[in-house]
């Protein structure tokens, strides 16, 4: 997780520290242009990606890298997610893109994400996770939530296609339920 402090600096979480035990003094001030920082703790291994986003998008003030389950499943398939829910389209656009695989924690990953993400607020990373950004942390968290919901819907839709099962007919289900469970009547 990182937050832009000004046009040249971000505060970023350290690598290898449990967020539940994180203290304010553990946060690292880092120059987004040079990646220089002070202190004994190492910054997040995805610092290159965070910095690349801040350098490219001046309106972004918060970046979150995470590994939500549905998004990671889609990213492992190197698929892109159509955003069908209109309430998320204004935040995510019509499609959540997936960046080509690159080794984690490398400039190569940052470049791959930036090529695919462009001005979008979120992007899947093949075989890795997601990156989400926003004007503030609240919006960045909302982007992750919207991405995960969209990925869930996409997976559920595709499981139906893979299984060959159609959506069940609600009217038929009600009829079966009433016939089978209606008190006092024998099952027909």
Model-derived segments and spans:
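Glycine-rich flexible loops
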Residues: 1-188
């Amino acid at each position: 997780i990182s937050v832009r402090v000004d046009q040249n600096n971000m505060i970023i979480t350290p690598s290898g520290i449990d967020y539940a035990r994180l203290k304010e003094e553990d946060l690292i001030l880092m120059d987004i242009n040079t990646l220089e920082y002070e202190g004994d703790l190492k910054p997040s291994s995805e610092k290159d990606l965070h910095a690349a986003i801040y350098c490219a998008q001046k309106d972004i003030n918060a970046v979150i890298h995470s590994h939500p389950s549905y998004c990671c499943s889609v990213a492992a398939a190197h698929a892109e997610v159509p955003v069908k829910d209109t309430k998320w389209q204004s935040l995510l656009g019509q499609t959540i893109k997936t960046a080509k695989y690159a080794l984690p924690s490398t400039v190569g990953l940052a470049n791959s994400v930036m090529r695919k993400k462009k001005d979008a607020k979120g992007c899947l990373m093949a075989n890795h996770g997601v990156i989400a950004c926003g004007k503030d942390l609240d919006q960045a968290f909302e982007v992750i939530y919207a991405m995960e919901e969209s990925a869930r819907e996409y997976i559920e839709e595709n499981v139906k296609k893979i299984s060959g099962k159609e959506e069940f007919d609600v009217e038929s289900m009600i009829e079966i339920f009433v016939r089978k469970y209606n008190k006092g009547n024998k099952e027909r």
